[in-house]
Amino acid sequence: MAQLAGQPILILPEGTQRYVGRDAQRMNILAARIIAETVRTTLGPKGMDKMLVDSLGDIVITNDGATILDEMDIQHPAAKMMVEVAKTQDKEAGDGTTTAVVIAGELLKKAEELLDQNIHPSIIIKGYTLASQKAQEILDSIAKEVKPDDEEVLLKAAMTAITGKAAEEEREYLAKLAVEAVKLVAEEKDGKLKVDIDNIKLEKKEGGAVRDTRLIRGVVIDKEVVHPGMPKRIENAKIALINDALEVKETETDAEIRITSPEQLQAFLEQEEKMLKEMVDKIKEVGANVVFVQKGIDDLAQHYLAKYGILAVRRVKKSDMEKLAKATGAKIVTNIRDLTPEDLGEAELVEERKVAGENMIFVEGCKNPKAVTILIRGGTEHVVDEVERALEDAIKVVKDILEDGKIIAGGGASEIELSIKLDEYAKEVGGKEQLAIEAFAEALKVIPRTLAENAGLDPIETLVKVIAAHKEKGQTIGIDVYEGEPADMMERGVIEPVRVKKQAIKSASEAAIMILRIDDVIAASKLEKEKEGEKGGGSEEFSGSSDLD
């Protein structure tokens, strides 16, 4: 609101909130740091879990950063940016979501200290940009190259990703499944390995133990055989995939058929039966003994299929049809008349089995499957969900290493190395930007410090010890949280893909820079309906307080 000759001028609607300059920066930094603090205690093998209960009473128990932030109903716009950091990290690298968010929060904390010293945001932004670019170069220089057939390294990296999750007791077993699954679906393109993780299906079923989780060289479908008279088990299966219905189609035009005698009705029904029999005869003629249909199967068609000893499954999801095609080598056919023996896929066995009291179709023993399934088992829904998240992380980590062929040491070793190298680089740059680069270097120490804190160690004492050992013994020295002492992370098998770390630093610095650029927040007033819904709900406005120092 401005005032001219005593007349108030309303520029923004009534009820609009506005924060300018340092107030806006302080508020945004606080919101982002609260998010970072929320996930910080989950970091590392000794990290704690979060229990999230939604408005319907559904419970999620996890220590996966991306899942925690995705499940939380976050209102503040700056806090939402931190959620985007986690989502980007998850999409691009598959692991390191908590690391990225914690680093972003610490970068903002250090930036606030510089702002309090009257250093302009533009200078901090320039320093952070230089530091982020230099960090990418340093990570490339310290990364160790690995061959795709180095099973031991892939296994250790997968185990590192699973460590700290609920499935930790079976981490070696699950890591083996993840490595085998990724290697089966990996394809060579232009001399490089490429992995489409959509070709690895994770199917969950409660019951049994985590150890009962298994890899199927093929596809598992949560469906059952359509007719009780059909065989439940077919060996040396010849598989047809049809994305149309095995039914007589209705015409799109509003046509009417006038039947004036019982003979005409009989002829009509016989013609319908003949059409359905021709469809089934075509399937039998090409040599198929298993058929998966994306749409429905008429009762009469089911009868003929059962009569010919053909196993049929209907209403199969499009994504499952595509996986079946990749696993068995079959081609998906739209028109049944076009079906040929060349369109059929092969599998050693197609069988309907009971899993946790429900029927499922197993298509296994495929010769060179480019789609596989991991059937996840566990005692409760929460265990099964957490095993799924652990496997997702492990699969993505193995994918990163196969595609990039580069690894670095975990356990805070790479962050300490970056911190030391960036301190040296800051002196070369000089000027006020030097302060920002030094702040960036200091912020990276939050990872080893947090690992120590979450393990119940003295963070300052541990950090001093580790940095001294790191400078003396080399760049792979990090924190062994089990022993509470500095150790060679490569020797201990704590390995991460370089892509995870590069993306974490890139995402964190970009988010911090974006938040630092904001010097004005204009928030429109909420709609009346929203206000009514919030009464008594304790919903916080943008302004908030926290016990963060």
From Swiss-Prot:
Forms an oligomeric complex of eight-membered rings. Molecular chaperone; binds unfolded polypeptides in vitro, and has a weak ATPase activity. Residues 528-538 have a biased composition (Basic and acidic residues). InterPro entries: Chaperone_TCP-1, Chaperonin_TCP-1_CS, Cpn60/GroEL/TCP-1, GroEL-like_apical_dom_sf, GROEL-like_equatorial_sf, TCP-1-like_intermed_sf, TCP-1_chaperonin, thermosome_alpha. PROSITE patterns: TCP1_1 (PS00750), TCP1_2 (PS00751), TCP1_3 (PS00995). Belongs to the TCP-1 chaperonin family. This is Thermosome subunit. Residues 540-549 have a biased composition (Low complexity).
